[in-house]
Each structure stands twice: as structure tokens, then as C-alpha cells.
Amino acid sequence: MEEKNLVKVQVPGTSANLGAGFDSMGIALNIYNYVSLRQLEPGSGVIIEVKGEGADFISRDKDNLVYQAIAGVYREIYGSDVLIPDLEITLENNIPLARGLGSSAAAIVGGAVAANEMFNGELTRDELLKHVLELEGHLDNIAPAMYGGLTCSLITRENELMFRTVDVVEDWNFIIIVPGQELSTQKAREALPERIAFQDGLFNLSRANMLILAFQQRDYELLWHSMDDELHEPYRAKLIPGLDRLLQEVRGAGIPAAISGAGPSIACVLSEIEEEKIVRELGKEKFSAHGIESNFFKLKPDNSGAKSILH
């Protein structure tokens, strides 16, 4: 395979945890970031252009996450002592940052897949996955961004990665309620307790089993019961005003809902058109009561994952 002068990769956003699948499940959704690479003449340097989300503050130097992923894959292909060529990197971002929709995972996966595509790379997706985990340690976002669908993952006792992917039917719509207030992953992590009660662990374990079956069997009632949590949501929901009450009322309306990733967004799964109005009204009401604006994304599952779209 020869090197290419120009590549463009599409990578989906993700919603991790889905309630009971804390740190082990995630789903890819059809909101996309795009990474374009173009090789430049030697001496041109690295040029990074950012469009869309984060354009005002995303790093445009070698600290950029996409560049770090590109550099890592290049060294994996050619060796650690080889100089990385000069590049023009264009990022078109649609995934909101710091909202629990996998923006960091999308950046790293996009950079890695684009580099493998450009630089004569024959690394498998599994090999790329291991590489990107060194930059982004959350497999629950990385795996669905790379492969698409619903992914379930674990780390074996021998410290090996293991995961499986389930294609998700596209009948169900996801409404993502995105409050206009950031929540860093670090702050969301710090809110978690050091120990959990045995009953809370059992609560999640029983629902995580059913959560996978609910998606496989298109069982909406089962999804409502299983998309629930006692390990992280009770603590994180208190970090954003109105979030706790909103989650309770959406679920109380019979709609499966969970904090997306570390938050602060909420992922709701709809089976009927009428439910969309309920979710939007509740989202506006609960956040506006605290002076927080909210945005809504109507999405569907993405079963393809990251892929080249320039041939």
C-alpha cells in the first residue's frame, strides 16, 4: 500500500455507560467529527485548522489530541526515530466538547485511523485500539467510536483488552439533552465514592445483563428497566443544577434515560414520536429554572464506526 497525499476520516460521537453499563458499555451515534490530513512540502511545519465545536480554544500545536494520535501511529508504522512529515490537519467538529458525548475519543480515534490510512498503514483496528487507549483510557468511548454499534468491554486478569460489538437497530431515536454548562471528566470522577454498597453493585450487575438483551431484542420495556444505575448517576447528577430532577421525570414518563458518559448530557431513547415533545419540554423546563440553556440532538445509532470517506 502506497502513502496517500490526502485522506479524510469520519468518526462518530458516543454515549457511554447507558446507565447500568458503567465504564464498560458505550454506543456510537450519528453525530460526526471529521479529520482531514494533507501532506505538505518539507519545511512547511504542522498546520492545524479547527472548524465548529472548540474552534476558539482547541490547541493548534503538537499538544493537539488528533496530532498526538497521528504521531503515535506514524511511529508505530515507521519506528520511533523517524521524523513525522509536515502536515495540514483540518478538524471539522460537530460533537460538543465536555458534554459526555465522546469528543476526546472521537479526536483520538479519528487521528489514528486517518494516520493509518495515509501512511501506508496496515495496522488492524484491534492494533489501533490498543494504541489509542494509551492516549484515551476509556474503552467505553473508544471502542464504539472505532467500531460502531453497542460495545461491551473488559480488561482480563492478564491485563488484556476484550470487547464485543452488537449492531443496534435504527428504529429507536436518541434525544440527547445537552445543557449549556460543561462538566469535566475529572470533576465527574472525583464525585464518585471510593466504595460502593453490595446491593448497589448487584443492582447494576442485574441490569447490565438485561441492557444488552434489550438492545438485541428491541425490547423497549426491558430497556426502560435496565437503563438505570446506582454506581455513578446519584453522585454526578448533583453536579449540574436541575440534572437530577430532569433524569427522574424523564424516566417517570416511561422513557429510558441515562447520563451520557460522565455527563452532563442526558441520553434518552424514544420509541414513539410523541415522546420527543415530552423530553424537549422537560429539558427546557428543568434547566431554564436554573438559568441554564439547553440544546437537543436527535440521533440514531451508528453501526459503522470510524471510516475513510475519501477514496
From Swiss-Prot:
One of its GO terms (cellular component) is cytoplasm. InterPro entries: GHMP_kinase_C_dom, GHMP_kinase_C_sf, GHMP_kinase_N_dom, GHMP_knse_ATP-bd_CS, Homoserine_kinase, Ribosomal_Su5_D2-typ_SF, Ribsml_uS5_D2-typ_fold_subgr. It catalyses: L-homoserine + ATP = O-phospho-L-homoserine + ADP + H(+). One of its GO terms (molecular function) is ATP binding. GO terms for biological process: threonine biosynthetic process. ATP binds at P96, L97, A98, R99, G100, L101, G102, S103, S104, A105, A106. Pfam families: GHMP_kinases_C (PF08544), GHMP_kinases_N (PF00288). Coiled coil: none annotated. Keywords: Amino-acid biosynthesis, ATP-binding, Cytoplasm, Kinase, Nucleotide-binding, Threonine biosynthesis, Transferase. Pathway: Amino-acid biosynthesis; L-threonine biosynthesis; L-threonine from L-aspartate: step 4/5. Its EC number is 2.7.1.39. It is found in: Cytoplasm. Belongs to the GHMP kinase family. Homoserine kinase subfamily. Catalyzes the ATP-dependent phosphorylation of L-homoserine to L-homoserine phosphate. NCBIfam families: PRK01212.1-4, thrB. This is Homoserine kinase. It comes from Natranaerobius thermophilus (strain ATCC BAA-1301 / DSM 18059 / JW/NM-WN-LF).
